[in-house]
Amino acid sequence: MASSDKVPVACPASSGDGKEPMGNPTKTTTAMLEKGTAMMQSMKPIRQMSLHVCSFACYSHDPGRQIEVHIYGHRVNQDFLQCAVYDSNSSKAHLIGIEYIVSEKLFESLSPEEQKLWHSHDYEIQMALLVTPRVPELVAKPELKNLAKSYGKFWCTWQIDRGDKLPLGVPSLMVSPQDVNLGRIKPELVKKRDEEHGISTESLKPSRDGICGPEKKNLVADYWVRFRKGFALDVVETDMKRTAPFP
């Protein structure tokens, strides 16, 4: 059975550079039909997304594997955001996962077992690893201050860095950059991101002075930093619950 910390069984979808999904090019008739229906449909959930940040994430079971992520968020209320995660901000970006972000208050209401799955955001913001593309720091700073006190739970559904041409296997839990050996983002990844977006992480760092993390950093979050243990999912066969026998 599939596991998030094992390479999937070899197949056409598991070999390649992961840049282009498998499948034929979209037909002109299909594209025209979709444009027409998009004009008639509300797309309300998607139109609620008003936040875009770019950062990096590490695999919980293998922090040495690090990826650039673009997070598009919908603020449900002051304490909760729900986000779609992509591998870039281009029109051909891959949807690679989802992240939920909660305030310190909501996080502290969770059970310790649940808290193990969540990560903090203060370090990546203070180190300017998390940026708001095209938004001036002065405008972004109030939101960055809020995010620095928050916690996130990010499930990666498409391991593009592995070269997968389709989403394979089960989701992987992701963790945020941290000031420990395996949690420090590789310089070449930061350099590539900066060049693509015309920014300088080093130049942004001074503007992050005064941004603080949670009032009382929860020791269960960022579980791997303290306990040196990550989390991986396994798919296991199980008996189905049913109220009547199968025909």
Swiss-Prot record:
Domain of life according to the entry: Eukaryota
Region of interest (Disordered), residue spans: 1-28
Cited PANTHER family: OIL BODY-ASSOCIATED PROTEIN 2B, PTHR31360
Family from the record: Belongs to the OBAP family.
Protein name, per record: Oil body-associated protein 2B
Species of provenance: Arabidopsis thaliana
